[in-house]
C-alpha cells in the first residue's frame, strides 16, 4: 500500500508539472495509471479534483486572456452532456472503463503527435457539437482537453490565448463533472479524502511548471508532454 501511495504521488506530481508548463495534459497523463491502480471512478474523481484545484494557480492569469466567444459555445453543451459520461463511468464494467480511459489517451496523444488538427476556423455549430462530445468524454474518462486542443489549434489565437482557453474550459467542465459525480453518489468520503491527499503535490508541481512556461522551448515542452501521455496510456492498456 505504501508503494502504491508513492506511485500515485509520483504520477500526480509529474502530471501537475507538465500541466503547469503546457496548460493541458494533467488528466490525460495521470488518468490511465491511476485507473489501473485505484479503479476508474477514483481515477476520474482524483483527476477532476486536481484539474479544478489547478485553477487556484492558473485561472487568474488565464481569465483576462481567453476567447470568450469560442469558449461559450464549447462550454455550455459540454456541461449539459457531462452527466452522460458520468453514467457510463459508474455503470460500465470497471475493467472496460480502464481500457477505454487508456485508449482515449493513446488515440489523442497520437493525433496530437501527428500534427492533426481541425482545418477550419472554429464556428458556433462545430463548437456546440464538439462541446457535447467532450462533455461525455470528460464525465466518463476525465480526459476532455485533447479534442479541444485539436480544434483550437485551427484558430488564429496565439499560444498564450489557446493555453488560457484550455485552462478556463477544463476548469469549468471539471467543476461541473465533480458536481455531477457527487450528485449520483460516486464521491464518497474515502474517495474524496484520497483525492484530497493528492492536491498539495499537484498544486506545487503545477506552480513550478507554470514558472517555466515561456522559458522552455514550446515544441520541446509539447512533445515531452505528449510522449508522457502516450507512455501512460500504453501502460494503462497493458496492465
Question: What kind of feature is each model-predicted range?
Answer:
Residues 6, 46, 97-103, 220, ...:
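Alpha-helical transmembrane segments
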Residues 5-73, 135-138, 145-202, 206:
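Small-residue-rich hydrophobic segments that form or flank transmembrane alpha-helices
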Residues 207-229:
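Interfacial loop-to-transmembrane junctions
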Residues 48, 102-105, 109, 167, ...:
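Residues within membrane-spanning alpha-helices of integral membrane proteins
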Residues 123-143:
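Hydrophobic alpha-helical transmembrane segments of multi-pass integral membrane proteins
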Residues 55-64, 86, 91, 98-125, ...:
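Transmembrane helix exit motif
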Residues 41-44, 69, 95-98, 125, ...:
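Residues that define the loop-to-transmembrane-helix transition and helix capping
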Residues 43, 84-89, 94, 98, ...:
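Hydrophobic alpha-helical transmembrane segments in multi-pass integral membrane proteins
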Amino acid at each position: 500500500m505504501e508503494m502504491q501511495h508513492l506511485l500515485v504521488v509520483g504520477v500526480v506530481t509529474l502530471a501537475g508539472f507538465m500541466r503547469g508548463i503546457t496548460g493541458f495534459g494533467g488528466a490525460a497523463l495521470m488518468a490511465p495509471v491511476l485507473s489501473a491502480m485505484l479503479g476508474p471512478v477514483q481515477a476520474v474523481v482524483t483527476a477532476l479534483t486536481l484539474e479544478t484545484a489547478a485553477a487556484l494557480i492558473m485561472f487568474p492569469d488565464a481569465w483576462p486572456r481567453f476567447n470568450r466567444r469560442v469558449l461559450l459555445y464549447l462550454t455550455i453543451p459540454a456541461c449539459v452532456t457531462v452527466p452522460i459520461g458520468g453514467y457510463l463511468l459508474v455503470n460500465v464494467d470497471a475493467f472496460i472503463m480502464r481500457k477505454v480511459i487508456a485508449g482515449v489517451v493513446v488515440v489523442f496523444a497520437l493525433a496530437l503527435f501527428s500534427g492533426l488538427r481541425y482545418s477550419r476556423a472554429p464556428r458556433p455549430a462545430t463548437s456546440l457539437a464538439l462541446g457535447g462530445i467532450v462533455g461525455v468524454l470528460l464525465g466518463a474518462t476525465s480526459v476532455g482537453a485533447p479534442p479541444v486542443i485539436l480544434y483550437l489549434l485551427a484558430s488564429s489565437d496565439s499560444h498564450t490565448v489557446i493555453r488560457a482557453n484550455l485552462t478556463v474550459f477544463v476548469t469549468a467542465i471539471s467543476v461541473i463533472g465533480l458536481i455531477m459525480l457527487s450528485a449520483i453518489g460516486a464521491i464518497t468520503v474515502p474517495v474524496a479524502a484520497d483525492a484530497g491527499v493528492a492536491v498539495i503535490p499537484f498544486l506545487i508541481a503545477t506552480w513550478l511548471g507554470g514558472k517555466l512556461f515561456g522559458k522552455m522551448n514550446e515544441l520541446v515542452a509539447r512533445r515531452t508532454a505528449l510522449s508522457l501521455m502516450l507512455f501512460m496510456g500504453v501502460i494503462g492498456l497493458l496492465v
